């Protein structure tokens, strides 16, 4: 590394305590290029609060380079230089450990939020549930739910007129050029496919293909969305998210190809709270969901080999937590708890530590 003064589009702070902490093996972090600095911040972000914290000047600098290179850290930092509730910020939702979820966050941070709100299209599905509950399984889809009324009609019309320009904010400036961080580059390889059920297209982020869908929902009416502090887009609220999962489980629990992921999502939601009666009522206004839930639980409990397959295919990080949730659901319905395998008794984190 040479000693030539680094030319930058903005001023580098005099001190970079957090960068120096996560780059302890680098004698002078200011000799790193901006892209190298950003890469170190991205890879070391989960050490916030462990190795140290950025100063206010360093936070402003991180935000500047994140915006300049369109990094996923933009969404992590939120709308101001310093995240709200910074004492708890990293411990709760400041960093997604799975790379695919970091890349999903990159896509979310480039969407046209005004368009989503106007169409009442809300982020949901299993990816939302996993990202909200400790990333217990690896989900590679981005699913938005849009009501079957004026919302979906507006969505279809605008997408037909403007294509990707309707869905993405500043579509022409998406991070795909040479100056952008390789891990953050977005490619939209195909045309948008639309029909009466939804619109869909693949998104490639840093070489990883993510399936993007905006689904027309006619079975239930959505309430007001929620805005988690990690999400740059509106999300299904708790009632609607659980109602959607109850409906999805009722539709497809008998199929082994689904790998019981709707039941597993419900189990992890149950760890956080009892299934609200409002969610049950909303789902059952469409069709029966509790009897299929009971049958899905029995099917899952009775087949330990099938459960193992589900854990492997879905990359479940903590099977013991899944069974904790399954047992709560079972007890809610008057069923016995699960006879556990060894894998379901001891946390994988404990085994690997």
What are these regions (language model features)?
Residues 3-35:
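N-terminal acidic leader/helix
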Residues 42-50, 66-73, 271-274, 291-292, ...:
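Short alpha-helix boundary/capping elements
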């Amino acid at each position: 590394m040479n000693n030539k003064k680094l030319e930058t589009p903005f001023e580098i702070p005099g001190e970079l305590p957090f960068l120096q902490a996560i780059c302890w093996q680098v004698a002078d972090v200011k000799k790193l290029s901006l892209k190298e600095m950003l890469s170190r911040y991205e890879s070391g972000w989960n050490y916030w609060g462990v190795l140290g914290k950025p100063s206010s000047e360093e936070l402003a600098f991180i935000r500047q380079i994140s915006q300049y290179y369109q990094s996923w850290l933009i969404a992590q930092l939120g709308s101001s230089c310093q995240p709200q509730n910074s004492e708890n910020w990293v411990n709760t939702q400041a960093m997604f450990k799975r790379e695919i979820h970091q890349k999903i966050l990159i896509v979310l941070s480039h969407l046209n939020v005004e368009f989503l709100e106007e169409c009442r299209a809300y982020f949901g599905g299993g990816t939302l549930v996993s990202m909200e509950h400790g990333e217990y399984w690896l989900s590679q889809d981005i699913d938005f739910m849009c009501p079957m009324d004026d919302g979906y009609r507006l969505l279809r019309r605008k997408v037909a007129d403007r294509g990707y320009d309707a869905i993405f904010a500043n579509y022409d400036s998406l991070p795909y050029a040479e100056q952008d961080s390789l891990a953050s580059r977005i490619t939209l390889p195909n045309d948008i496919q639309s029909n009466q059920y939804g619109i869909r297209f693949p998104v490639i982020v840093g070489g990883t293909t993510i399936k993007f869908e905006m689904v027309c929902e006619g079975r239930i009416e959505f309430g007001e969305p929620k805005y988690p502090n990690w999400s740059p887009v509106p999300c299904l609220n708790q009632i609607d998210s659980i109602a959607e999962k109850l409906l999805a489980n009722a539709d497809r629990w008998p199929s082994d190809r689904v790998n019981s992921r709707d039941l597993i999502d419900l189990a992890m939601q149950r760890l956080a709270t009892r299934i609200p009666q409002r969610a049950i009522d909303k789902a059952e206004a469409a069709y029966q969901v509790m009897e299929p839930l009971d049958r899905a639980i029995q099917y899952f409990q009775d087949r330990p080999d099938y459960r193992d397959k589900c854990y492997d295919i879905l990359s479940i990080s903590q099977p013991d937590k899944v069974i904790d949730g399954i047992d709560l659901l079972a007890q809610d319905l008057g069923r016995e708890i699960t006879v556990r395998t060894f894998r379901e008794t001891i946390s994988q984190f404990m085994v690997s530590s």
